[in-house]
Amino acid sequence: MPKVIRDLPDTSSYWAAVWSVCAMPDVHVICDAPIGCYNLVATAIPDYTDAIPNIDNITPSVITEEEVGGTGTAPAVQRTYDDLVTMKKISDDTKLIVVSTAESEMIGSDLTDLVKMLKPGTTFFHSESLTEDEWVGRDRILRWLWEQYGVDAGSVEPEPGLVNIIGPTYGCFNAPSDLHEVKRLIEGAGGRVNMVFPYESKLADIAQLAKAQYSVVLYKEFG
């Protein structure tokens, strides 16, 4: 009899993308998802792990049988974007990111071309939710954010004694207390915290990561 996996200890890379990106207040995410896949990652679980009732800066495209069976998800994402503009949920300074989910990936939705017709600067992150777990996903989304938005880093001069803390996101039970302890250790050793990315950062400031002399990169036991 084959071994049956009764439960999984990790979530998917889609969850990793949402928990990483939505920690930054100047970002809004459109998740290309049915309503249930939005509810879990944005309302039910962060209430449990982070004591926040819901993540405000994410909106689902609410894909249904119509999109799955024929039209594809692009019309749903376009409609969601139009609604956000009408309701003034995104400003000129908001960075808009569209993220794929397992459901949209199952039907081959690639919104690379669509995002070019949305708000200027909108990007599409293919989360690889069907094949990657949250730990691979966290690494990949952080690297992707740097590659997409950190282009000005070359003009930033490093400052001695500054230290980045890279890795804290939503979805970790003891994130605030563990982060406080990491900060205390850095400052006790004579360092000064430059940025906590993405947990206490804005995406617009990502190039300032280059200002640090050192970076402390956290691993999955954090939180």
Describe every region a protein language model picked out.
Residues M1-G223:
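An N-terminal assembly and electron-transfer interface module characteristic of large anaerobic redox
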